[in-house]
Amino acid sequence: MKTNQSWGGRFAEGPKEAVAQYTDSQSYDRALYAQDIRASQAHARMLGRQGVITPEEAQLLVEGLDRVREEIRSDSFIWKPELEDVHMNIEARLTEIMGNVGKKLHTGRSRNDQVGLSFRLFVADRLETWRQRAAALCAILVQRATEHAGDILPGCTHLQPAQPVSLAHHLLAYAWMFRRDAMRLGDCLDRVRISPLGAAALAGTTYPLDPQSVAKDVGFDGIYGNSMDAVSDRDFVLEALFGGSTIMMHLSRLCEEIILWANPAFGFVRLPDSYSTGSSIMPQKKNPDVAELMRGKTGRVYGSLMGMLTIMKGLPLAYNRDMQEDKEGFLDADRTVEASLRLMAGMMEEIAFRTDRMREACKAGFLNATELADYLVGKGLPFREAHHVTGQCVAAAEKQAKGLEDLTLPEMQALEPRIGEDVYAILDYAAAVQRRETPGGTGPQSVAAQVAQLRTWLAGMDGMVQ
């Protein structure tokens, strides 16, 4: 059977059906249709300006591609698996519409640089959405923090009670994480927005192309420095997937805390019904399924990153068909990251914090022990000695099943005579939070400064996704 592939001139027969199915990518890379058309229109305009084709032909190609775009948007476009991918499907339909003029679109271009530009455009568009969603989640966390500036809860290390902190401070820790995530994606975009068009298959082209004008036309910052590098690397995908993996890691950590806090043993939050599910057998259950699934889906995004690293690790220069596998993993990661950020923003907006339970929990675990040690330092003890005396006080309180603040003054003075009546004000949990005003600390002025910093940054994030 004679092949009708674009590359079929030197072949006597086409690929077997099983081979065609195995190599087909149009079933998923059609997601790139808008970016492919955008890149092809920029290429056509450049060909017209450079005299490679006439300006009239360039305009016809642009108009024909507009028509193809509308057909795809309206679901009237007929996808043909035998044409392998989105790029050849679009070009074939353009040729059906425009005749021989359509066949001129690919002049001076290889699928290698064509695919590279289309995918870079797609990744850039998606990263911008991730960036805006991360910023939107950051904004919600900042807002919830301002609502709880005066509420305290146990801060933990090793998941053990450590020191009291404000709920605002705890929430802002995640706000800073998602701010960094958004900034990291912005840095990544600087390297994604590099156009490979003009590199052709690997060695450049003899046509008098103007790659810089194509880059400018599609909104990119510049062009490749080496044509072989331009078509043979996918480090921009790796970097994007790392950014997505880091977002998911931060989301997963927040999910873990939500899951713990929703457990009645903690009882720190009430989950919205709309972000919970029940049990088919236990009527009382209210399960944090959204948080659990988000924690689980983190592994999917990690898998996409590891898969892409593995695909690229042994490829010689320049382009190899292995690189077709770059898209499915990214497409899956894109759906997961975008949906997770959107759902977490909604959940954090509606979640109810049980601040009474948080405050009560501060009384367990001797969270004010560091306050006593610092108090003793103020009384003239070296810190290591103060640390030892405080440990003795903790042991004495623990033996009586009460808090440090419940020890009598004589009980404490028996361990260290310099302890005075003023120690009880020091041992107050809320006061302990208020005293920590170092930069980035949990004190109210420090928290207010953090809020101001984050809001200043958010104000520069134009067009945040809601």
UniProtKB/Swiss-Prot annotation:
Keyword Metal-binding listed: no
Localization (cell): Cytoplasm
E.C. code: 4.3.2.1
Catalytic activity: 2-(N(omega)-L-arginino)succinate = fumarate + L-arginine
Main location, first listed in the record: cytoplasm
Alphabetical UniProt keywords: Amino-acid biosynthesis, Arginine biosynthesis, Cytoplasm, Lyase
Keyword Transport: no
Pathway it works in: Amino-acid biosynthesis; L-arginine biosynthesis; L-arginine from L-ornithine and carbamoyl phosphate: step 3/3
Main EC class the enzyme belongs to: lyase
Stretches of the chain forming a coiled coil according to its record: none
Gene Ontology CC entries for this record: cytosol
MF annotations from Gene Ontology: argininosuccinate lyase activity
One Gene Ontology term from the biological process aspect of the record: arginine biosynthetic process via ornithine
Domain of life: Bacteria
Family that this chain belongs to: Belongs to the lyase 1 family. Argininosuccinate lyase subfamily.
Protein name per UniProt: Argininosuccinate lyase
